[in-house]
Amino acid sequence: MGENGAGKSTLMKCLFGIYHMDEGEVYLDGEKVEIHNPDEALHRGLAMVHQELQPIPERTVAENMYTGRYPTKKFGPIQVIDHKKMFEETAKWLDDVKMPYNPKAKLGTMSIAQMQSVEIAKAVSLNARVVILDEPTSSLTDNEVEALFRIVRDLKSRGVSLIYISHKMAE
């Protein structure tokens, strides 16, 4: 927690491998680790839900969840996206975080809170052991904040560690 400009988001971007750290050490499960890029962070079980969401509004919920890692299947001599598997798995992950949205819905039709829920489901689908939430309530209504907190409590009860960044003392 800290005021605007205190470096909270910068620190999280260092942990996630977006920025290079000049000093300090990071330990994960008691082991010193160096994370040079987001792929390494994901490989080590860290996921981040950024304050500035970067959805692709023209694509479906499922396509946004699986961007860059689409499930594939063989179609003759080539690999093609396995849409059926992608939609089924997306429905499972969304249900897992208690947000049963339609995986085929265009993300651009959803509220900011729903888009954040999709990002959290994406983090869970990556088998993240640590989820960094960077000011997730900054543009949410009170009802949307409560829905987000339900997701956070559920993840915590499952043993997922959460790093929650905020400048709001009440959170």
Task: Cite the ranges covered by each PLM segment.
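Glycine-rich phosphate-binding loops of nucleotide-dependent enzymes
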Residues: 1-171
